A protein has these predicted regions:
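Catalytic cores of carbohydrate-active enzymes across secretory and cytosolic contexts
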Residues: 1-288
Length: 288
C-alpha cells in the first residue's frame, strides 16, 4: 500500500469481515502467513531536478512554444502569479470542485482579480466512457462560465489545456508556476505533488495539497486542505500568495530533502527487500 492508513484499513477489514487472525501487519491463513506493509512510492528526483536546471539554462531559441506563451503572460502581467493544476480527467481528481473553489476564491478576495491565473492541464482519460464525457462537458462549462464572469480585456482567470503533454512541457509548467493546487477527492499517492517540488531548484513556490492524497502523509510542509471546503481552499490560496519567500524556501528545502532521500529507487529496493524477507519467512513456515 502507499500509506499506513490504507494498510490499517485493509487489515481491519480482513479481521472484521473475513475473521482472519491479524497480528500487527501479518494475516495468518491455514497454509501461509500474508504480510501487509506500506511503501510510499517515490519519484526519480534527480531526473526532475536535472531537467529543471537545464530548463533554466536554455536560451530563448531553445524554449518551447508553451514556455514562450508562459513568458509572454508573465511579461504582460508581472505582478500576477500562476497557479498550476495537473490531473487526469477523472472523478477522483476533484477538478470540478477545484474550479468552483477557485471561483469562490475570486468572489471572496476580489483584490486578486487580474493578479492570478489558473493554468489547468487535464489529461484525457477514458474519453470513450459516457460518464467521463459528461465530466469533460462539466469542466468545459465551468471554465467557460468563470472566464466569462471574471475576464477583462487583458486577463483571463483560467488557462485550460485538455491534452497530454510531453515531459519538456511539464517542466515548463512546473518551473513557471508559483503555486501548485492539487485537490483530489481521493488519490492513492499523487506524484505530481512530488514532481513539482523536485523542480523548484531555487526552493520557491507553494504546494497546496488535498488531505485525501496519499502524498499528504509525507508532505506536511505543504498547505494541506480539505478539497470539499471551499473556504479552506480559498484561504490556502491567499496564504500561498502572501507567504514570504523565506518561508517558502524553508518549507521546500525540508520537502526536497525528504523526497530526495526516498526516491523511486529506494522505494523499489525496500519493496524487493521486504518481498525477499517474506519469501524466507514463508519457507520457514512450511518447514514447521
Amino acid at each position: 500500500f502507499h500509506t499506513y492508513d490504507y494498510e490499517r484499513h485493509f487489515l481491519s477489514s480482513v479481521s472484521r469481515i473475513l475473521r482472519h487472525q491479524v497480528d500487527f501487519n501479518e494475516i495468518t491463513l491455514p497454509d501461509r502467513i500474508v504480510k501487509v506493509d506500506s511503501f510510499p512510492m517515490g519519484i526519480d528526483y534527480e531526473k526532475f531536478e536535472k531537467a529543471a536546471l537545464e530548463h533554466y539554462k536554455s536560451t530563448s531559441e531553445e524554449q518551447s512554444e508553451l514556455q514562450r506563451r508562459l513568458d509572454h503572460h508573465l511579461e504582460a502581467t508581472p505582478d500576477a502569479k500562476m497557479i498550476l493544476s495537473i490531473d487526469r480527467l477523472d472523478y477522483t481528481k476533484g477538478i470540478a470542485h477545484r474550479i468552483r473553489a477557485y471561483e469562490y476564491f475570486l468572489d471572496k478576495y476580489p483584490e486578486f482579480i487580474e493578479k492570478v491565473r489558473l493554468v489547468m492541464l487535464a489529461v484525457p482519460s477514458r474519453s470513450n466512457v459516457p460518464q467521463y464525457q459528461k465530466l469533460k462537458r462539466e469542466v468545459d462549462e465551468l471554465v467557460g462560465r468563470i472566464n466569462g464572469k471574471f475576464s477583462t480585456v487583458s486577463w483571463t482567470p483560467i488557462w485550460y489545456f485538455y491534452r497530454s503533454m510531453p515531459f519538456e512541457n511539464l517542466i515548463d509548467l512546473y518551473t513557471s508556476c508559483d503555486i501548485a493546487l492539487l485537490t483530489p477527492i481521493r488519490d492513492g499517492m499523487n506524484l505530481v505533488a512530488k514532481e513539482y517540488i523536485a523542480t523548484r531548484t531555487n526552493h520557491t513556490g507553494v504546494l497546496i495539497l488535498s488531505e485525501m492524497a496519499g502524498a499528504a502523509h509525507e508532505m506536511n510542509e505543504a498547505l494541506i486542505i480539505n478539497p470539499n471546503n471551499f473556504d479552506q481552499v480559498a484561504q490556502a490560496l491567499k496564504t500561498a500568495f502572501e507567504m514570504p519567500e523565506e518561508e517558502q524556501i524553508q518549507r521546500n528545502k525540508m520537502l526536497q530533502k525528504r523526497l530526495r532521500r526516498y526516491g523511486v529507487e529506494k522505494w523499489a529496493q525496500d519493496f524487493m527487500k521486504a518481498l525477499k524477507h517474506t519469501r524466507e519467512n514463508r519457507d520457514s513456515f512450511k518447514s514447521i
